[in-house]
């Protein structure tokens, strides 16, 4: 249930999606730009929660940390694949 708790928090799935879609580590500001309208404090909180859950990690590159999904995060995206397929089908019927 803790995983659903984390994934149900506002912006969490969007952060995971953007980290996955980027394909390479991404800096905080770039990630914030991709997540339209998210405050820096909320993004910081979500990244911390995802790091503590083992879903995301940061790598120091120069002076800025860059964020990426861990192997566990990649597994999560794979597990969510059927949900994405269902949501596309649902959207087409609306």
Identify what each model region corresponds to.
Residues 1-41, 53, 61-68, 74:
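N-terminal helix-turn-helix DNA-binding core of bacterial DNA-binding proteins
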Residues 17-18, 22, 68-71, 75-94:
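Amphipathic alpha-helical dimerization/coiled-coil segments
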Residues 47-48:
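Short, hydrophobic-biased segments on the C-terminal half of alpha helices
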């Amino acid at each position: 249930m803790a995983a659903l708790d984390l994934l149900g928090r506002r912006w969490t799935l969007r952060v995971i999606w953007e980290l996955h879609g980027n394909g390479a580590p991404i800096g905080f500001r770039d990630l914030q730009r991709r997540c339209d309208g998210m405050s820096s404090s909320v993004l910081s909180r979500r990244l911390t929660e995802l790091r503590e859950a083992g879903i995301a990690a940061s790598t120091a590159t120069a002076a800025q940390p860059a964020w990426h999904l861990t192997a566990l995060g990649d597994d999560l995206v794979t597990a969510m694949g059927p949900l994405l397929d269902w949501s596309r089908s649902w959207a087409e019927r609306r």
